[in-house]
Amino acid sequence: MEVTGISAPTVMVFISSSLNSFRSEKRYSRSLTIAEFKCKLELVVGSPASCMELELYGADDKFYSKLDQEDALLGSYPVDDGCRIHVIDHSGVRLGEYEDVSKVEKYEISPEAYERRQNTVRSFMKRSKLGPYNEELRAQQEAEAAQRLSEEKAQASAISVGSRCEVRAPDHSLRRGTVMYVGLTDFKPGYWVGVRYDEPLGKNDGSVNGKRYFECQAKYGAFVKPSAVTVGDFPEEDYGLDEM
């Protein structure tokens, strides 16, 4: 198997399982831990993450290694495009049992009974401290979000409605216009600045999802983050439209 010198952030692999006879082609981030990777595989093969054993095979179907370190990154193994990851299920389900849904027993379970079970996704995530059960990570993410919101609020407070401004677009081009709105919105979290451009370089008419924030012509309105806005003496540019 050929492994590139500089690994891409994602990798395309084939997923096979001891529970069925087909393969799935999927793309995953190399930054996933094996524990997180198993959780994603649950939706692909139907096996509980806590009952999985993973094996890595090359594009030539040669066995390379087991993926058995829960806290190791997927990218720390010699995984490259075209490899196959085989899931061995230890839950006791027979081959093909998940392929015919008519054979799957349908039942309901109370939240209390589900909480007591040890082979569920929830119990696995709790033991591995993943997702909402990683209190330290969640606290860190909440603190970072609060910090970003505080910084955006400070930047927004320096921008006044009616001010002339220059906006740095994602392609780094500069666009001039007038500030028409500053504050929170319903369409996305955080603080936003509504701008009426001098030219039809925007994406809306001052409204988003049926709610109007300011008035302007179609394609002249845009909402940008405060960090992309510079207020000052930016007169409307003369494009020579009055010249003969």
Curated annotation (Swiss-Prot):
PTM-bearing positions, type N-acetylmethionine: M1
Source taxon at top rank: Eukaryota
Phosphoserine, modified sites: S65, S110, S128
Post-translational modification summary for this protein: Phosphorylation by PAK1 is required for normal function. Ubiquitinated in the presence of GAN which targets it for degradation by the proteasome.
Modification N6-acetyllysine, positions: K219
GO molecular function annotation: alpha-tubulin binding
GO BP terms: cell differentiation; nervous system development; post-chaperonin tubulin folding pathway; tubulin complex assembly
Residues forming coiled coils: none
Residue numbers carrying Phosphotyrosine: Y98
Tissue specificity field: Widely expressed with highest levels in brain. Broadly distributed throughout the neonate brain but restricted mainly to ependymary cells in the adult brain where it is concentrated in the cilia.
CAP-Gly domain span: 183-225
Annotated compartments: Cytoplasm; Cytoplasm, Cytoskeleton
Record note on quaternary structure: Supercomplex made of cofactors A to E. Cofactors A and D function by capturing and stabilizing tubulin in a quasi-native conformation. Cofactor E binds to the cofactor D-tubulin complex; interaction with cofactor C then causes the release of tubulin polypeptides that are committed to the native state. Cofactors B and E can form a heterodimer which binds to alpha-tubulin and enhances their ability to dissociate tubulin heterodimers. Interacts with GAN. Interacts with DCTN1.
Family listed: Belongs to the TBCB family.
Name of the protein in its database record: Tubulin-folding cofactor B
Gene name of the record: Tbcb
